[in-house]
């Protein structure tokens, strides 16, 4: 199959298995959920009544004070007491094998092509790390909510995009399923397309 280059009167020959496969919603969902789960820190921790600092002594005698009976000061109903169902440190990571991860990326890329949300250009760069220059370039291409994917890290492009709302720059190595589906349009250079094919082959 072929992908038309937006900035040139030509087309790029690409693999059908990477950019023309059926959309597997269940697989994409599983991989995206796992990716988000793996980003979780999971380091929260609260103390139960057994773990909080304090005396185990009965605060006052059982009878004769007129107050409600109390056996300790570390219970959940006391100020400074333990938490009833205390949250503990937890590992939220989910395992996704390479075949599934690659399959999900291929599925997302293919769906982007079908929806005309994947824009391929011969090259894309800015002369200096100027947000104004990048904004003007994107405006000329009628692009706003866009992920720019380059073959290698372009520092000028990265710095220029850093202060733009709903614009992000990634190299092929930093590509992930969540970023691909988070933007309305994905702008990819021809070199990046070749690298993506090699990576997902």
From Swiss-Prot:
One GO cellular component assignment for this chain's record is: ribonucleoprotein complex
SUPFAM superfamilies reported for this sequence? Ribosomal protein L4 (SSF52166)
Query: Mind listing the UniProt keywords for this protein, alphabetically?
Result: Ribonucleoprotein, Ribosomal protein, RNA-binding, rRNA-binding
Q: Name one GO biological process term.
A: translation
Q: Name one Pfam family in it.
A: Ribosomal_L4
Q: Which GO terms describe its molecular function?
A: rRNA binding; structural constituent of ribosome
Q: Where is this region: Disordered?
A: 45-71
Keyword Cytoplasm, does the record have it? no
Protein family: Belongs to the universal ribosomal protein uL4 family.
HAMAP family named among the record's database cross-references: Ribosomal_uL4_B
Tell me, how does this one assemble? Part of the 50S ribosomal subunit.
Function text: One of the primary rRNA binding proteins, this protein initially binds near the 5'-end of the 23S rRNA. It is important during the early stages of 50S assembly. It makes multiple contacts with different domains of the 23S rRNA in the assembled 50S subunit and ribosome. Forms part of the polypeptide exit tunnel.
| NCBIfam families per UniProt | rplD_bact
Q: Can you name this protein?
A: Large ribosomal subunit protein uL4
Please give the organism: Shewanella sp. (strain MR-4)
Could you tell me the gene encoding this protein?
rplD
